[in-house]
Every structure is written in structure tokens, then in C-alpha cells.
Amino acid sequence: MKKIKAIFYIICVVFGLMTASCVDDDSFTTSASDVLSFSVDTLSLDTTFSNVPTPTKTMWVYNRAGKGIRCQSVRLESGNQNGFRVNVDGTYLGQTSGFQTQDVEIRKGDSIRVFVELTSKLQHTDAPNLVEDNLIFLLESGVQQKVNLNAYSWDAEFLKDKIIAKGVNEVFSNQGK
């Protein structure tokens, strides 16, 4: 009988400790004063040629608030009209998702990673063009935060099946033609 009482007390103590140690990490704030922090305010990609993808750049989105923050949506402001491709915490902002993701949760003290690359469209100009868009984070509190995405793009003329000839007046010639 004493063993049963001892086991019962041990079970009660263990259960009590487990219940008391539970942390409420599932609470989310709707306060407009709780906002996200970003590793950069502008994500600049390398200068690129039109129709040639840039290397992927990344940024971090931090939640330094005392509670979790839920983003109602994360989207490209232009709806991907400029050629940016974005992945937010593993979700690609593609055509099937309407170039946005919804209900992104960032727990208190946690962060998510955003991956960005660009394949700019042909601009039909001789000068470099600034390609820009904004990544919009709409928080559950109604606060909207933006991160600017930009890169310069040059139109290039790609010469295929051409060789540079040495000592010939014609600089470019067709191979075997």
C-alpha cells in the first residue's frame, strides 16, 4: 500500500512539473507596436544581363517581440512583373500561389529566411536599367512593412556560332559558313 501511495505521489509531482513548465509559445500579438526586424532594408542583387538569372541572395526576418507575429500575407508589390523570384520560409511565391504566401507565423525570438533571385526582362535600351520591386509583409495587426528589392540589368547581344578571327579585317565570322 505504501508503494502505491509513493508511486501516486511521484506521478502527481511529475505531472505537476510538466504542467507548470509548459510555456505559451502559441500566443500571437495583434499590437501595432510589435513589428518585424529585417537583416537588410534593401536587398540589392548583382548587376545582371537581361534573361540571365542572378545568383540567389538571402535575408533574415526576425521577430524580436515578446509574442509571436503572424503575417497575413507576404507578397511582391508588382505581382512578379519585374522578374524577381522569392521563397519565403520554404514557400515559393509563384503563379500558383498568386505570387504570395499567407499565414506565415514567426514565433517570439525566432526568424525566417527569404531567398531572392532575378531574371530581368529585355529592356531594349543601351544603358543599364534599375529593376525594382518591394516585398510586402502585411502583419495580422494591419501594419505593412516593405523590403526593397533591386538590381541593375543590361541588355546584351549574345553572339552564337561566332569566332574571333585573328589578323582578319572582319572581326566576327561564322563557323563553317
Positions of PLM-derived features:
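Low-complexity, Pro/Ser/Thr- and charge-rich linker/hinge segments at domain boundaries
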Residues: V147-Q175
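Intrinsic-disorder/low-complexity, polar/charged segments enriched in Ser/Thr/Lys/Arg/Asp/Glu/Gln
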Residues: T54-T58, S111-R113, Q144-N148
